[in-house]
Amino acid sequence: MKERTIQPVNNGLNGNITIPGDKSISHRAVMFGSIAEGKTTIKGFLSGADCLSTISCFKEMGVEITQNGDEVTVVGKGLEGLQEPKAVLDVGNSGTTIRLMSGILANTPFFSCVQGDESIAKRPMKRVTNPLKQMGANIDGREEGTFTPLTIRGGDLKAIEYISPVASAQVKSAILLAGLRAEGVTAVTEPHISRDHTERMLEAFGVKVTREGKTVKLSGGQKLTATDIQVPGDVSSAAFFLVAGAIIPNSKLILQNVGMNPTRTGIIDVLEKMGATFTIEPINEGASEPAANITIETSSLKGIEIGGDIIPRLIDEIPVIALAATQAEGITVIRDAHELKVKETNRIDTVVAELTKLGARIEATDDGMIIYGKSALKGNTVNSYGDHRIGMMLAIAGCLAEGKIIIEDAEAVGVSYPTFFDELQKLAK
């Protein structure tokens, strides 16, 4: 378990950062390229541990995948060309891999067994396995399909019209991917619109997808045709530096190539509402996945209320939003964020516990947290508990604190941002 010491930053964070590739899009590009017909080239791929787990799983099913830096080539096998894996498919720490891949495996006539690390073993799978069973897939797991390892034997599926109890892009995507070979029209309706990378990318691969309000539909029997994918920078990774630029005195950061998919930009809306000073320069208007360069500088923030439809658009950014709120004048209330409890850690409990160690005034609620600003943070020993987003949030907190912060289990950040600490060090000079 590696630890990392973060010293206070005296002269602010300044400079340019090129944000690494979007994790969600990188996963999907490999998966969709694998089940497409033809050769797909992916540029800007994120070489984090999670996305490498996706590559490993599809290689295990006979897909030819080669990687050269951030460029990946996938020679697709088509929906019917995947081979039965000889070994257990290990997704590591990646919830995206196991949930989306389950939708693909539900289509396959062969047997597969899927597992991950200790964190994955605690995460709820029934939200995916239940609808896939309704479609006709044979899926089982611990506690009646609630937890990994999962065993899957797919086959002939029937389309369903599924009303999802949660706004989850992973649940929606698993069902849509299963629907590609299902008989009939598969439809998923959510309580709020979740991120739509799957819909956008399926369309890029030639699949017709219909969107009607909170419902997404596709007809079975459609094939994917290989295409080239340009992956923009991950706005969830950018979020840590957006907040850092806003709350660390004497800072000015230029973040290049930040993905601006409107289902993911809740962090931008929240920072704007809190009073952050930034400019956005679009760089690829008209692309399937829009991107921009963002300049942000030290700002005076105020507390706000966050809840409702915006939550699915910023669910992964809530840990660092909570940090921003500790440096805002007034009270910030975050609600409707039950999904935080089933992430890599229970992020409500983890955020509250670790920021409290640093002197923040913050309370957990059943569906979020209440943060009382403005707090002077102090040095202490904290822990990521294997959660990459907690680790990065604590590192930004360390730049502000009076005294050094020691982060235990700091290597967890490699899941989504392998060069994070190098970037932070460079900007602090």
Curated annotation (Swiss-Prot):
Fetch the Pfam families from UniProt.
Answer: EPSP_synthase
Looking up SUPFAM superfamilies in the UniProt record yields:
EPT/RTPC-like
Q: Which Enzyme Commission number(s) are listed?
A: 2.5.1.19
State the UniProt keywords alphabetically: Amino-acid biosynthesis, Aromatic amino acid biosynthesis, Cytoplasm, Transferase
Alphabetical list of InterPro entries matching this protein:
Enolpyruvate_Tfrase_dom, Enolpyruvate_Tfrase_sf, EPSP_synthase, EPSP_synthase_CS, RNA3'P_cycl/enolpyr_Trfase_a/b
**Principal EC category:** transferase
Q: Where in the cell is it found?
A: Cytoplasm
Catalytic residues in the record = D316
Q: Which GO CC annotations does the UniProt entry carry?
A: cytoplasm
Molecular functions (GO terms): 3-phosphoshikimate 1-carboxyvinyltransferase activity
Residues that hold 3-phosphoshikimate according to the record: K23, S24, R28, S168, Q170, D316, K343
The residues the record assigns to binding phosphoenolpyruvate are: K23, G95, R123, Q170, R347, R389
Q: What is its main location?
A: cytoplasm
Describe which pathway this protein belongs to, using the record's wording: Metabolic intermediate biosynthesis; chorismate biosynthesis; chorismate from D-erythrose 4-phosphate and phosphoenolpyruvate: step 6/7
Q: Which reaction does it catalyse?
A: 3-phosphoshikimate + phosphoenolpyruvate = 5-O-(1-carboxyvinyl)-3-phosphoshikimate + phosphate
Q: Which family does it belong to?
A: Belongs to the EPSP synthase family.
The record's function comment reads:
Catalyzes the transfer of the enolpyruvyl moiety of phosphoenolpyruvate (PEP) to the 5-hydroxyl of shikimate-3-phosphate (S3P) to produce enolpyruvyl shikimate-3-phosphate and inorganic phosphate.
Q: What is this protein called?
A: 3-phosphoshikimate 1-carboxyvinyltransferase
Q: Which organism is it from?
A: Bacillus cereus (strain G9842)
Taxonomic classification, please?
A: Bacteria, Bacillati, Bacillota, Bacilli, Bacillales
**Gene expressing this chain:** aroA
